[in-house]
UniProtKB/Swiss-Prot annotation:
Pfam families: ThiC_Rad_SAM. The lineage of its organism: Archaea, Methanobacteriati, Methanobacteriota, Stenosarchaea group, Halobacteria. Keywords: 4Fe-4S, Iron, Iron-sulfur, Lyase, Metal-binding, S-adenosyl-L-methionine, Thiamine biosynthesis, Zinc. Residues 7-27 have a biased composition (Basic and acidic residues). [4Fe-4S] cluster binds at residues 408, 411, 416. The gene is thiC. This is Phosphomethylpyrimidine synthase. One of its GO terms (biological process) is thiamine biosynthetic process. It comes from Halobacterium salinarum (strain ATCC 700922 / JCM 11081 / NRC-1) (Halobacterium halobium).
Length: 476
């Protein structure tokens, strides 16, 4: 079967492209051209029946990925489906199952069966769980894992194929060395075997598998900087040059490709990083982790990274990988997922507003109008997180009568600036101008993409009892 890239190059507008066009408020032909040029991807495995197609590309609304998954100490199917539900409910455009513990197949298939958004994985994690030692990994094992996950319905896979043996000495003087799990695993394998990265040497064979199932390749940045001290160094950019080569080779196989990026980057270097990736990788979508702009705030890295993510989105990054408050500290739970998603939906939206994406500011205007009109219920409805917005308001003013009040508990009755301003205008010569100030933006007519209009996400809680049992896991 052909991939979305091959269909696009043949001039065919697929059903997935039409659905994407509707969600983005764009012409289907614009979508087809972006996919054909490699400037956008539609991760849509032929076997993912629950998928509602979406698009990742710099000319479209900025997307957000949420990482979920268990570890060797936590998590079962019910826990993971709760994280999936939380992530999608609060606006995740894709999720990555990064499980490294037990029941990998059961968790992965449950996520795919229940997820309306694309599901990504890092296949080398499963490979590690199937051997006694990292050095026991073989090219055949990696190929087997990739093929199995492709058949299960995984929509995109991170492959750290650009980490080459000759790059490793470039990391010797780093402050934090190699911080990518995939990158460190492959570094150990290459060092102990004295051989080249098997994902690189067997890349063409892997691409043939991905093409057969239309799995998008997400070229992992195994040498991304793990501290601002290591940002934009020779190791990072040597790998990036290889990722540019691998992007073009994926396209030659008809495989959709996006490229992953840092990491930890000072604010003043972010735009240059985005521009460099776009040039080296011929405009392939850039998928960035953060980046964190400072390293001083464990427990608040959803904030330090959302700052960098906003600038990355403004500069042209196509998708942001969220960071939760638990980053560098522990495995996130459902509440951490909620906080991470809020930070990154804000970052993506703010980046789109700053970049002038069509209709992106309409949501802001609608909420500002409701705020000025003291329409509390509409403010809650339009909020990024309606439940939290109303809960915070109702902590101090819980009564229904306060939903008609022209103040909140921040300023009280006498010091509300908007009430004072309205009263002054009503009493003055420009009272007729109030009509202009209280017009209401019609979001149903907005040109904004779906992700830049409320609600941010809706998702029925998955039926955990229908998920595969732990006994179904092939990895045990």
């Amino acid at each position: 079967m052909s991939t979305q890239l091959q269909h696009a190059r043949d001039g065919t507008v697929t059903d997935a492209m039409r659905r994407v066009a509707d969600r983005e408020g764009r012409d289907p032909e614009v979508v087809r051209e972006a996919v054909a040029d490699g400037h956008a991807v539609i991760p849509a495995n032929h076997h993912h029946d629950a998928l509602d197609p979406m698009i990742i590309g710099r000319d479209f609304a900025t997307k957000v990925n949420a990482n979920i998954g268990n570890s060797d100490t936590t998590g079962d199917i019910d826990d993971e489906l709760e994280k999936l539900h939380t992530a999608v409910h609060y606006g995740a455009d894709t999720v990555m199952d990064l499980s490294t513990g037990e029941n990998l197949d059961g968790i992965r298939t449950a996520n795919i069966d229940n997820s309306p958004v694309p599901v990504g994985t890092v296949p080398i994690y499963e490979a590690v769980t199937r051997v006694e030692d990292v050095t026991d990994i073989t090219p055949d094992l990696l190929i087997d894992v990739v093929e199995k996950q492709a058949k299960q319905g995984v929509d995109y896979m991170t492959l750290h194929a650009g980490v080459l043996a000759e790059h490793l000495p470039l990391t010797d003087d780093r402050t934090t060395g190699i911080v990518s799990r995939g990158g460190s695993i492959l570094s150990q394998w290459m060092t102990e075997h004295g051989e080249q990265n098997p994902l690189y040497t067997h890349y063409d064979e892997l691409c043939e598998i991905l093409q057969a199932h239309d799995v998008t390749i997400s070229l992992g940045d195994g040498l991304r900087p793990g501290s601002v001290a290591d940002a934009s160094d020779d190791a990072q950019f040597a790998e990036l040059d290889t990722l540019g080569e691998l992007t073009r080779r994926a396209w030659d196989h008809g495989v959709q490709a996006m490229v992953e990026g840092p990491g930890h980057v000072p604010m003043d270097q972010i735009r240059a990083n985005v521009d460099r990736q776009q040039e080296v990788c011929d405009g392939a979508p850039f998928y960035v982790l953060g980046p964190l702009v400072t390293d001083i705030a464990p427990g608040y890295d959803h904030i330090t990274s959302a700052i960098g993510a906003t600038e990355a989105a403004r500069a042209g990054a196509a998708m942001l990988c969220y960071v939760t408050p638990k980053e560098h500290l522990g495995l996130p739970d459902a509440e951490d997922v909620r906080d991470g998603m809020a930070a990154y939906r804000i970052a993506a939206h703010a980046g789109d507003v700053a970049a002038g994406k069509p209709g992106a500011r309409d949501w802001d205007d609608a909420l500002s109008e409701a705020r000025y009109n003291f329409d509390w219920n509409r403010q809650f409805d339009l909020a990024l997180d309606p439940e939290r917005a109303q809960a915070f308001h109702d902590q101090t003013l819980p009564g229904d009568n306060y939903k008609d009040a022209r103040f909140c508990s921040m300023c009280g009755v006498d010091f509300c600036s908007m009430r004072i301003d309205q009263d002054a205008r009503d009493a003055g010569d420009d009272a007729d101008d109030m009509t202009e100030l209280t017009t209401e933006t019609d979001l149903s007519e907005s040109a904004a993409a779906e992700v830049n209009r409320p609600p941010t996400g809706t998702h029925d809680a998955p039926a955990a009892e229908q998920a595969p049992s732990p006994g179904d896991d092939d990895d045990d």
